[in-house]
A protein has these predicted regions:
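Helix-enriched interaction subdomains in cytosolic or periplasmic regions
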Residues: 1-13
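Active-site beta->alpha N-cap acidic-glycine motif
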Residues: 10-92, 96-99, 107, 120-121, ...
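Generic structural signal for well-ordered alpha-helices
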Residues: 54, 77-81, 109-116, 136, ...
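Short histidine/acidic/glycine/proline-rich micro-motifs that form metal-
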Residues: 68-73, 96-99, 130, 152-157, ...
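His/Asp/Glu-enriched short active-site or ligand-binding loop at hydrolase and phosphoryl-transfer sites
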Residues: 130, 135-172
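Catalytic grooves of carbohydrate-active enzymes
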Residues: 169-203
Length: 203
C-alpha cells in the first residue's frame, strides 16, 4: 500500500488530506495554528543555483531547509558550509538521489546512512516522495523525521510558467504549509524567477 500511495506524489500540487491520513508516520504539514510557512529545497547543493537561492533568501531575511543529495554536498562542501553558516537547516535526500521503491531496504538504508556521514541530520526526505512502507518504518526506528510536503511548486517542470505556479501556490498554501522547491539544474531558471514572488506573497 505504501508503495502505491507515494508513487503519485510528484503529480500533485497539493497532497489531499485523505492521502495524508492514509500514509501516516511522515510530516506533511507543520502546526496549522501558527502563521508560518516552511520553505524547502531539494536536490542541491550545486553552484549553478544554490548560491543564487541563498542570495535571495538573505535579501528577504528568510530561512529554509535544504534537503541535500550528499553526493553534491561532497562535491561542493563550501556550499554545504554556507547553507549552515547562514542559518538554514539541512536535510538528508540520500547520497545518490535514490528512489526507495526501486531498491532493497538494505541498499536504501545504507545509502541514507552514507549520506548522513556527510550531512549529520535527522531530517529526511525521499527523492520524488517515493519509498516503501518498510523503508519508512526502518527510518523512523532509526530516529529520522520523514518530511514530505503539502504544496509542490513543480518548478522543475518546463511546461509550467511562474505565473501558473504562483496561482496554484496562492490557492493551496495555508498556515503550516511545507512548500517544496528545487535548487537543481533542471529547475534553476524557474526557481530563481519564482522565489522572490513567492516570498513577497508569503510575507
Amino acid at each position: 500500500m505504501g508503495r502505491l500511495i507515494v508513487i503519485f506524489l510528484p503529480l500533485l500540487y497539493q497532497i489531499p488530506t485523505w492521502l495524508q491520513r492514509l500514509y501516516r508516520g511522515v510530516v506533511w504539514r507543520m502546526n496549522p495554528s501558527s502563521k508560518v510557512v516552511y520553505l524547502t529545497f531539494d536536490d542541491g547543493p550545486i553552484p549553478e543555483c544554490t548560491p543564487q537561492v541563498l542570495d535571495i533568501l538573505s535579501q528577504y531575511d528568510v530561512k529554509a531547509t535544504f534537503f541535500m543529495v550528499a553526493e553534491n554536498a561532497v562535491r561542493y562542501p563550501l556550499l554545504l558550509e554556507r547553507v549552515r553558516n547562514e542559518g538554514h537547516a539541512v536535510g538528508n535526500h540520500t547520497y545518490h538521489h535514490m528512489r526507495g521503491c526501486k531498491h532493497s531496504l538494505v541498499d536504501y538504508i545504507n545509502d541514507i546512512e552514507m549520506a548522513n556521514q556527510v550531512l549529520n541530520t535527522t531530517l529526511f526526505r525521499p527523492p520524488h516522495g517515493r519509498m516503501t512502507s518498510c523503508q519508512k518504518r526502518a527510518l523512523r526506528k532509526q530516529g529520522y523525521t520523514i518530511c514530505l510536503w503539502d504544496v509542490l511548486t513543480h518548478d522543475y517542470n518546463p511546461n509550467y510558467s511562474v505565473e501558473h505556479m504562483m496561482k496554484v501556490i496562492q490557492r493551496f498554501v495555508r498556515n503550516g504549509s511545507i512548500i517544496t522547491c528545487h535548487d537543481s539544474i533542471k529547475s534553476k531558471d524557474r526557481t530563481l524567477l519564482l522565489l522572490p514572488q513567492l516570498i513577497q506573497y508569503l510575507k
